[in-house]
Amino acid sequence: MKMSWESLKKWPPNVFALTSSLLAESGAYRLAVSPPKGKVWPRNPDFWTAELPDIANKVRAYAVGRDSAPPAFRKCWESLEKGKGLGVDSLVKPRQWKTCESILYLHAIADEACRGLGVPTGWPMSTAAEVDFSIRAYYLLSRHGTLANINPDLVRVLPKLHTPQVGATLRSFSHHLTTTASEVSINWQLVPSGLRPDRETINVMLFPFPYEIRPTDFKGVGESSFFQFSSAQSLNVGRIVRLIEEGRSRVGAIDMIVFPEASLSCRDLSRLQGRLRKEVQMPIILAGVRKPPSGGTLGSNYAEFIVRISERALYSGKQYKHHRWCLDDVQIRQYHLGSALDPNHHWWEGIQIERRELNFIPLTDAITICPLICEDLARQEPVAEVVRAVGPTLVIALLLDGPQMAARWPSRYATVLADDPGSSVLTLTSLGMALRSRPQGKEPARLVALWKDRKTGLLEIELPPRKEAIILTVCREWREEWTADYRGDGGSAATPFLAGIEPIGLD
């Protein structure tokens, strides 16, 4: 798909896609922190605060045909056009500094012009041009999973919520936009969640169901090396509703309920949402769902997200697991599954591998959730690159795993995401699976969840005896983040942190 330079110039996300490609392929972004001898970047130390915001406002108006291109933007674009015949590698050479400098300016201008996209209220829209710009941007994002009108198979331009505060990669030089070039499709919908965009706290209720898992819940599939998991414990919907009511009596509103990986059958989820949708204050549901094999095809393992948007309408989105779990000899013995699965073989989870997709779910201006399923937290490809690029404020990993201890693998990967890009991370497993994990010499542990954020650090979360759910009160802190070339974001980066834990039971 070819686009004219004029078409690229008129839409900031397109400009950002172009500058990102040039800076990444040439490695010239490093010159922003190590300019050639005798050069400085930016040329005017006050450019970020004194000039850039006004230029970005005018570029937004230009993008929707309500103003002409501002002189500073036009001058940089003309310089870039003059360098069209140059090889990309030449951008790092001192004699091409003027062209490289123009690309760096255009990169920052396009980034600043897209401030606030991707969250419910975003940047205050005080002019008709800003309203037009936001409507067009959200249309592209919701329909095509990209802010650019460039073929997403080539590149996607996405909103960005965190800027890495360590290291120096291309991601370190933008606050509001990022690019990805991968097979992963993006679903980013601004769904009316019922939460005020400026809400300071939300209450998330965790159900570590099933509470018991037996070896017979794991079965081989025919003569193959696949296994199927299906819990024998049925979901008591009435009891879940009573637990939610008990939670409300203790903390007030319950904004969201979460179930671990593969914890619910399709029928369980249907019965649960059917019961809850009758409520005016139906909580948002994020659940790990399993679907059995059918018609000669393998089953499915996915996360489903459900929001009540009106009295008659629900929004529902699915995200399928991207990697199969492999149960080897060590894990079969760790979870004491030898009576169901032969430890002399490797057993692979019997699920279809669907098209790779990531969901980003903005609940408030401060909390945008990205759900992951078990191995997807640990495997670097194909989704980890996209998660790091966007920097969602809260990653929720649904697991079918052992106890959530600081020494185990979920903690390691949560720490990586908390450091770069700066996301807060919640992991949740079932009590049944946590108690099945009994390595030699270790006592069973009721650690069903783990939380990691930059403000309060790492916390193991235990489900006490006689309790069936845990309510987490999540607050948010606004921080100023800086690009590697010292451009601040005005304190628009949010860090969700844990401010309260309330175990819930029906004593």
Show where each model-derived region lies.
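A short C-terminal boundary segment appended to hydrolase-like catalytic domains
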Residues: A469-D507
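CN hydrolase (nitrilase-like) catalytic-core segments centered on the catalytic cysteine
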Residues: K2-A108, D255, L269-A287, C374-T483
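Active-site catalytic loop in hydrolytic enzyme cores
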Residues: H175-D198, L298-A389
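Cofactor-binding loop segments of dinucleotide-utilizing enzymes, especially the Rossmann-like FAD-
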Residues: F209, R308, S430
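Long, charge-dense tracts
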Residues: L31-E212, P260
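Cys-nucleophile CN-hydrolase/nitrilase-fold catalytic domain and related Cys-dependent amidase chemistry
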Residues: S234-K321, P410-T415, D419
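Short, flexible loop segments at the rims of nucleotide/cofactor-binding pockets, characterized by
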Residues: A232-N236, E261-S263, W347-G350, P371-D376, ...
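Active-site-proximal beta-strand elements of phosphoester/diester hydrolases
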Residues: T201-F229, I367-D376, I396
